[in-house]
Amino acid sequence: MIQPISCGFLIVRGNPIESFLLMKHSRRWDLPKGHVDEGETELQCALRELREETGIVAEDIEIDPTFSYENRYMVNQNRYGGKGVVEKKLLVYLARLKNPVKITVTEHDGYRWFSWKPPHRIQDLTIDSLLETLERHLQQQS
């Protein structure tokens, strides 16, 4: 079984950060992200998923080359055609919106711009640790 890899973006507004975008799933808030297609790089995957799930295109954002976040956690293999559990890799890039854009919701129940007011308690599995890692990164940069 090949390790599932999911890639996405944390999209922020403002400099310094004023807010960040999360997508509403039926039971949780999450990033615009998805699985890498064959022949696709991780960054290409993240950009494709961002466009598909929000309507935000590469020209709308400025990717921060100094930050990326990786997390690994166990998921049921039945989602990927197997049995038992398998380790999944999540890779998240940071990008700032250059200009206001209209969010087009295609695969979720909605979206929300959350205010940047650490500490955040939104979703234990991935979002909270991503935001904590970004907060530490920003403190080191200043």
PLM feature segments, named:
Residues R27-R28, P119:
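Short, solvent-exposed loop/turn segments at secondary-structure junctions
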Residues P4-S6, S26, V85-L90:
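Short connector loops at helix/strand junctions that flank enzyme active sites
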Residues V36-I127:
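Unchanged
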Residues H120-S142:
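Charged phosphate-binding loop/patch that engages nucleotide di/tri-phosphates or the phosphate backbone
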Residues M1-S19:
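Conserved N-terminal beta-strand and adjoining loop/helix that marks the start
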Residues L21-K24:
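Short, acidic/hydrophobic/Gly-rich beta-strand patch recurrent on exposed beta strands
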Residues D30-G34:
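A short gly/proline-enriched turn/hairpin at secondary-structure junctions
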